Amino acid sequence: YEMAHGVLPPGTVNPDGPIVSEPDGYHMSWTVQLLPYLDQTPLFLAVDFSKGAYDQSEEITEASMSVLICPSYPAPTGAVSYAGCHGGTEVQIAEDNEGVFYLNSRVRYRDIPDGSTNTIFFGEKVWSSAELNWLSGTRTSLRNTGHEPNQLPSIRDSREKLYQSNQTPDGMSDPAVVGGFGSWHFGGAQFALGDGSVRFLSENIDKLVYESLGKRADGTLPVDF
């Protein structure tokens, strides 16, 4: 995508902010933009871009793509296991949070002075029934490193039993909260960095180092993580 467009895909496309996790708005996520590069061109062509993320056909909103689902978790139809990194602190998606993906973002590799090796692009997240469909450029497809991996109590507990229909991760009942990364793996979660490498980061990672990895230009380069 970057080679074809000269920029990384926007975290979410919408006329303006704020962006909250409610089914109201255009809210087209980075996942939609990347479909042709994930061997999903027919699905990409089926999306009606004159309509928003919540006005697509059921065939589209409930599509399941194995490339976007963690093999360790049998996610329901229309769900995704991975989120783009919005930044290093818990702020609104409409703000440039020094991450790579945010509202109408057009980040180039030269806009990542910390280096792609030291910048998180994507990470795992724990799905909950409070999330919107996979096209939604909200916390469904964007998270931040302001919370250490797996550190929300409900994420830790959910690894012992799957979410019930009325359970949501801590704070996720607030549509303004973006939230952090997490996984069904004990000990941490998988992350894709800007250089194409994938790293398993411990849930005990140093908080400041982890926050720095979520930022593309804070000038703090982690020596080891």
Predicted regions and their residues:
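Surface-exposed loop/linker segments characteristic of extracytoplasmic
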Residues: 1-225
